[in-house]
C-alpha cells in the first residue's frame, strides 16, 4: 500500500447549524485519523471537504431567523472552519458550494449527463402550500415516516431510519412554515435515470466484499427494491441554476450538485498549488483509491446515486470504499442539532482539550452499530487510557532517566521480546488502519501501552541502576523504544499531545516521519518530562 495515491472525500456538512459530536463521529474524525496514518506510511493523500450551502436546509433556517440564505451560509461556514481547526482537522481544501467555481463544475456535469441521455425531462407531483403560495420541496414538509413510524421525518429523508423519501410518501404531511397540509401539484423537472445503471451497480458491488456489512447490506437492499429515476431539480430560488433556456427558475437539487463538490474541491486545490490537472490523477488514474467518509444517512447518495453519476459521466473513478459509520447517540437518542440533543463540539472544547475528545470519540466510533456518548465515560476513558496507561508509562521512563542524569546509548542489536512485541503490534495496527478499522487499531495501541507498563515494572530499573548499569541502560532503551512506538501510533488520534511527547523523547526526526524509524535502532536525547495530560474531574466539567 505504501507509496500510492489516496483520495479522501468527507461529506460536506450543511451550513445550517453548529457541528455536534455526532457529525465528528459520523465522518470527520475517522477520516482525519485515516489521512494522517496514510501520510505517515508515505502515501500521497488529497483530503477534500466543503460547506454544503444550497437547498432547503439553509433556506428553512433562514426563513425561521428572518435572514437571507447567504447570511446563514456565511455564519456557519466560518463557524465550521473554526471548529475543525480547534479539533485539529485540517483539510487540503474546504470549498463552498456557493462559490462560482462550483456552479460552473456542477452545471457542466449536469449538461454532460443530459447530453448522454442520463438526465431527462419529466413531470412529478410536488407539495404546494396554498397559504404561502409556492412549492415546498424537501425539508419544508414533515410527517410520519411510512417505514419506521418516526413522527418528524422530512420530505427528503427520515433521520431515524435513514431512508430517502419523497414528500408524498409521508403520512399526515404538513408544511413546516404554515402548519397546513400541502396539496400535491404537477411540476416539470429533470430526472436522473438511475434505472440505467442498476445492473452495472450490482456488478460493481460484487467487488466490494471488504465493505462494512452495514454499508453493503443497505446498498444491496436499496438496489433490490429497483432503481427508479430521481428528480434532480427543484422549484426553489436558492441553488445552482439549471443552465438551460426556459428553466432559469429551476435549481439543481442540492444532493446532486453537492456530490459534485468533491470534484470542485479537487479542481480548486489543483489551481491553488499551480497544477491545474492534478485533480485528474485522483479521478482518472485507476490505481488511485477513493474513500468517502460519511454518516449512515448519506449512504445511498454515495453508494448508489454518486456512482451512477460517475458512470454516466464516463471514465471517472468509482468509490473504492465508503466506510460509513452508524449513529452516535446521546442517552439513547440520535445527536441532532435541530432537536438540541447532545453537545456541540464547541461546547465540549470549552471544557476539555481537543485530544481528549478525539481519543474518546475514536474509542467509541459507531463503525458497525450505534454507539452512545457519555461525558462520564469520556472522563473514565481519558483518565484510564491516556493518563494512567500511556502518560504514566512515558513519564516514569523519562523521569527516571532524568533523575539519574542518564545518557541512554543505543545497543548494537535488539533481541528483546518487548521489541518484537512492539513490532508485531505496529504491523497489526497498520493492517487495521489500512482497512479503516479505527477502533481495532486503537485497541492494539492500548494493549501495547498496557504491555509497556508491565515491561517497565518487571525491568525494575531502580534496582538495576545499583547492580548492573549496562542492563539498566538496555532496559531503559527498550522502554524508550516502546514509548516511541506508542507516541507515533497515537499521533493520528491525538496529534497535539503526541507531538509534544515526541519532542521530549529527543528523536532527531519530525514525528511526521516517525513511522520510517520505528523498527530501527535510533538514538534518543531525552528532554525533561512534561506530559501534556491532566486528569479530568467530572464534577468540574460545567456544560
Curated annotation (Swiss-Prot):
What's an example of a GO molecular-function annotation for this chain? metal ion binding
Enzyme's top EC category: ligase
Q: What Enzyme Commission number does this protein have?
A: 6.1.1.10
Q: How is the cofactor bound?
A: Binds 1 zinc ion per subunit.
Q: Which InterPro entries match?
A: aa-tRNA-synth_I_CS, Anticodon_Met, Met-tRNA_ligase_1, Met-tRNA_synth, Methionyl/Leucyl_tRNA_Synth, MetRS_core, MetRS_Zn, Rossmann-like_a/b/a_fold
Q: Name one GO biological process term.
A: methionyl-tRNA aminoacylation
Q: Does the keyword Nucleotidyltransferase apply?
A: no
Reaction equation(s) it catalyzes: tRNA(Met) + L-methionine + ATP = L-methionyl-tRNA(Met) + AMP + diphosphate
Single GO cellular component term: cytosol
Keywords carried by this UniProt record: Aminoacyl-tRNA synthetase, ATP-binding, Cytoplasm, Ligase, Metal-binding, Nucleotide-binding, Protein biosynthesis, Zinc
Q: Which CDD domains does the entry mention?
A: Anticodon_Ia_Met (cd07957), MetRS_core (cd00814)
Q: Where in the cell is it found?
A: Cytoplasm
Task: Report the cofactors.
Answer: Zn(2+)
Q: Which domain of life is it from?
A: Archaea
* Chain span(s) of sequence motif 'HIGH' region: 13-23
The parts of the chain that form a coiled coil are none
Which positions bind Zn(2+)? 145, 148, 158, 161
Chief location bin: cytoplasm
Motif 'KMSKS' region: chain residues: 334-338
For ATP, which residues are the binding ones? 337
Q: Which family does it belong to?
A: Belongs to the class-I aminoacyl-tRNA synthetase family. MetG type 1 subfamily.
Task: Please describe what this protein does.
Answer: Is required not only for elongation of protein synthesis but also for the initiation of all mRNA translation through initiator tRNA(fMet) aminoacylation.
Mind telling me what this protein is named? Methionine--tRNA ligase
What is the originating organism of this protein?
Thermoplasma volcanium (strain ATCC 51530 / DSM 4299 / JCM 9571 / NBRC 15438 / GSS1)
Q: Which gene encodes it?
A: metG
Amino acid at each position: 500500500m505504501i507509496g500510492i495515491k489516496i483520495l479522501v472525500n468527507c461529506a460536506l456538512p450543511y451550513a445550517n447549524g453548529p457541528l455536534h459530536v455526532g457529525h465528528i463521529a459520523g465522518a470527520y474524525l475517522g477520516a482525519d485519523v485515516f489521512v494522517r496514518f496514510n501520510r505517515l506510511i508515505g502515501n500521497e493523500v488529497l483530503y477534500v471537504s466543503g460547506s454544503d450551502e444550497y437547498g432547503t436546509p439553509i433556506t428553512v433556517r433562514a426563513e425561521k431567523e428572518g435572514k437571507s440564505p447567504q447570511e446563514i451560509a456565511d455564519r456557519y461556514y466560518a463557524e465550521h472552519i473554526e471548529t475543525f481547526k480547534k479539533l485539529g482537522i485540517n483539510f487540503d481544501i474546504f470549498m463552498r458550494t456557493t462559490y462560482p467555481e462550483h456552479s460552473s463544475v456542477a452545471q457542466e456535469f449536469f449538461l454532460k449527463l443530459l447530453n448522454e441521455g442520463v438526465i431527462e425531462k419529466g413531470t412529478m407531483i410536488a407539495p404546494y402550500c396554498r397559504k404561502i403560495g409556492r412549492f415546498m420541496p424537501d425539508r419544508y414538509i414533515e410527517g410520519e415516516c411510512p417505514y419506521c413510524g418516526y413522527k418528524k421525518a422530512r420530505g427528503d429523508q427520515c433521520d431515524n431510519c435513514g431512508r430517502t423519501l419523497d414528500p408524498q410518501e409521508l403520512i399526515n404531511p404538513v408544511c413546516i412554515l404554515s402548519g397546513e397540509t400541502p396539496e400535491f401539484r404537477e411540476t416539470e423537472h429533470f430526472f436522473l435515470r438511475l434505472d440505467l445503471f442498476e445492473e452495472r451497480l450490482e456488478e460493481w458491488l460484487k467487488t466490494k466484499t471488504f465493505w462494512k456489512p452495514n454499508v453493503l447490506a443497505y446498498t444491496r437492499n436499496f438496489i433490490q427494491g429497483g432503481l427508479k429515476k430521481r428528480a434532480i431539480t427543484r422549484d426553489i430560488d436558492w441553488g445552482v441554476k439549471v443552465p438551460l433556456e426556459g428553466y432559469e427558475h429551476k435549481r439543481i437539487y442540492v444532493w446532486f450538485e453537492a456530490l459534485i463538490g468533491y470534484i470542485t474541491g479537487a479542481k480548486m486545490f489543483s489551481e491553488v498549488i499551480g497544477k491545474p490537472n492534478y485533480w485528474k490523477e485522483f479521478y482518472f488514474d485507476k490505481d488511485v483509491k477513493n474513500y468517502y467518509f460519511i454518516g449512515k444517512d448519506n449512504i445511498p447518495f454515495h453508494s448508489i446515486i454518486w456512482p451512477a453519476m460517475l458512470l454516466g459521466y464516463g471514465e471517472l473513478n468509482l468509490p473504492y470504499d465508503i466506510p460509513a459509520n452508524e449513529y452516535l447517540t446521546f442517552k439513547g437518542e440520535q445527536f441532532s442539532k435541530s432537536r438540541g440533543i447532545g453537545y456541540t463540539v464547541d461546547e465540549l472544547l470549552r471544557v476539555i482539550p481537543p485530544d481528549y475528545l478525539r481519543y474518546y470519540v475514536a474509542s467509541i466510533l459507531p463503525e458497525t452499530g450505534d454507539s452512545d456518548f457519555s461525558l462520564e465515560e469520556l472522563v473514565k476513558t481519558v483518565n484510564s487510557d491516556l493518563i494512567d496507561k500511556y502518560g504514566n508509562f512515558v513519564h516514569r521512563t523519562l523521569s527516571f532517566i532524568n533523575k539519574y542524569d542518564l545518557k541512554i546509548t543505543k545497543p548494537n542489536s535488539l533481541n528483546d521480546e518487548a521489541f518484537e512485541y512492539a513490532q508485531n503490534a505496529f504491523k497489526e495496527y497498520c493492517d487495521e488502519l489500512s482497512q479503516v478499522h479505527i477502533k481495532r487499531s486503537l485497541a492494539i495501541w492500548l494493549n501495547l501501552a498496557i504491555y509497556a507498563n508491565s515491561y517497565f515494572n518487571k525491568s525494575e530499573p531502580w534496582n538495576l541502576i545499583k547492580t548492573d548499569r549496562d542492563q539498566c541502560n538496555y532496559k531503559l532503551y527498550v522502554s524508550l523504544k516502546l514509548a516511541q512506538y506508542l507516541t507515533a501510533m497515537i499521533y493520528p488520534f491525538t496529534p497535539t499531545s503526541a507531538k509534544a511527547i515526541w519532542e521530549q523523547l529527543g528523536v532527531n526526526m519530525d514525528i511526521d516521519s516517525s513511522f520510517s524509524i520505528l523498527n530501527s535502532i535510533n538514538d534518543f536525547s531525552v528532554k525533561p518530562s512534561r506530559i501534556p495530560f491532566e486528569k479530568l474531574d467530572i464534577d468540574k466539567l460545567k456544560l
